[in-house]
UniProtKB/Swiss-Prot annotation:
<dbReference type="GO" id="GO:0000447">
    <property type="term" value="P:endonucleolytic cleavage in ITS1 to separate SSU-rRNA from 5.8S rRNA and LSU-rRNA from tricistronic rRNA transcript (SSU-rRNA, 5.8S rRNA, LSU-rRNA)"/>
</dbReference>
<dbReference type="GO" id="GO:0032040">
    <property type="term" value="C:small-subunit processome"/>
</dbReference>
<dbReference type="GO" id="GO:0005654">
    <property type="term" value="C:nucleoplasm"/>
</dbReference>
<keyword id="KW-0690">Ribosome biogenesis</keyword>
<dbReference type="InterPro" id="IPR002716">
    <property type="entry name" value="PIN_dom"/>
</dbReference>
<comment type="subunit">
    <text>Part of the small subunit (SSU) processome, composed of more than 70 proteins and the RNA chaperone small nucleolar RNA (snoRNA) U3.</text>
</comment>
<dbReference type="GO" id="GO:0005730">
    <property type="term" value="C:nucleolus"/>
</dbReference>
<feature type="region of interest" description="Disordered">
    <location>
        <begin position="22"/>
        <end position="47"/>
    </location>
</feature>
<comment type="similarity">
    <text>Belongs to the UTP23/FCF1 family. FCF1 subfamily.</text>
</comment>
<dbReference type="InterPro" id="IPR006984">
    <property type="entry name" value="Fcf1/Utp23"/>
</dbReference>
<protein>
    <recommendedName>
        <fullName>rRNA-processing protein FCF1 homolog</fullName>
    </recommendedName>
</protein>
<dbReference type="GO" id="GO:0042274">
    <property type="term" value="P:ribosomal small subunit biogenesis"/>
</dbReference>
<comment type="function">
    <text>Part of the small subunit (SSU) processome, first precursor of the small eukaryotic ribosomal subunit. During the assembly of the SSU processome in the nucleolus, many ribosome biogenesis factors, an RNA chaperone and ribosomal proteins associate with the nascent pre-rRNA and work in concert to generate RNA folding, modifications, rearrangements and cleavage as well as targeted degradation of pre-ribosomal RNA by the RNA exosome.</text>
</comment>
<dbReference type="GO" id="GO:0003723">
    <property type="term" value="F:RNA binding"/>
</dbReference>
<feature type="domain" description="PINc">
    <location>
        <begin position="67"/>
        <end position="166"/>
    </location>
</feature>
<feature type="compositionally biased region" description="Basic and acidic residues">
    <location>
        <begin position="37"/>
        <end position="47"/>
    </location>
</feature>
<dbReference type="InterPro" id="IPR029060">
    <property type="entry name" value="PIN-like_dom_sf"/>
</dbReference>
Length: 198
């Protein structure tokens, strides 16, 4: 038996005229886009983000005792691992009264971690912690912390996460608290606060 030839049936595909075809009337024809020539002498407009008046260059005048410290999920976990009391260690680091703050997103993140991190959840529910409500959608804590710190420059961010630290370093005037050598340390503080470095 021979092989059957597959012939293309005529007019199966609808033939369309291009919108630039010469056979179309002038009014129906698509006009070619003209490229706008850029004037090299014209001033270029740029959107520069406005910095708040509380900043004097990198110096943040809004920071002062009692310090409000935004706590990240992994900061609580690493503190438990290093056997550090959160509030007491913060006070030892800054030599002043500290109010640890925890957002709804961080709380939800700790709850999602499950039974293994129940100690972290118990610490997060401590009455000494100030609870900050979140109004945005989603429960990704890193974005929440970065957004909150960008809006209000009165916080210190406590985290051990490298990516979050990198993101916060781009925001001027926001100090970062981290754990090193089984003690809390602070980075980018306006005055010489913080535990001595070894």
């Amino acid at each position: 038996m021979g092989k059957q030839k597959k012939t293309r049936k005529y007019a199966t595909m609808k033939r369309m005229l291009s919108l630039r075809d010469q056979r179309l009337k002038e009014k129906d024809r698509l006009k070619p886009k003209k490229k706008e020539k850029k004037d090299p002498s014209a001033l270029k407009e740029r959107e520069v983000p406005q910095h708040p008046s509380c900043l004097f260059f990198q110096y943040n005048t809004q920071l002062g005792p009692p310090y409000h410290i935004l706590v990240d999920t992994n900061f609580i976990n690493f503190s438990i691992k290093a056997k550090l009391d959160l509030v007491q260690s913060m006070m030892d680091c800054l030599y002043a009264k500290c109010i640890p703050c925890i957002t709804d997103c961080v709380m939800a993140e700790i709850e999602k971690l499950g039974q293994k991190y129940r100690v972290a959840l118990r610490i997060a529910k401590d009455p000494r912690f100030e609870r900050l409500p979140c109004t945005h959608k989603g429960t990704y804590a890193d974005d929440c912390l970065v957004q909150r710190v960008t809006q209000h420059k009165c916080y210190i961010v406590a985290t051990v996460d490298r990516d979050l630290k990198r993101r916060i370093r781009k925001i001027p005037g926001v100090p970062i608290m981290y754990i090193s050598n089984h003690r809390y340390n602070i980075e980018r503080m306006p005055d010489d606060y913080g535990a001595p470095r070894f």
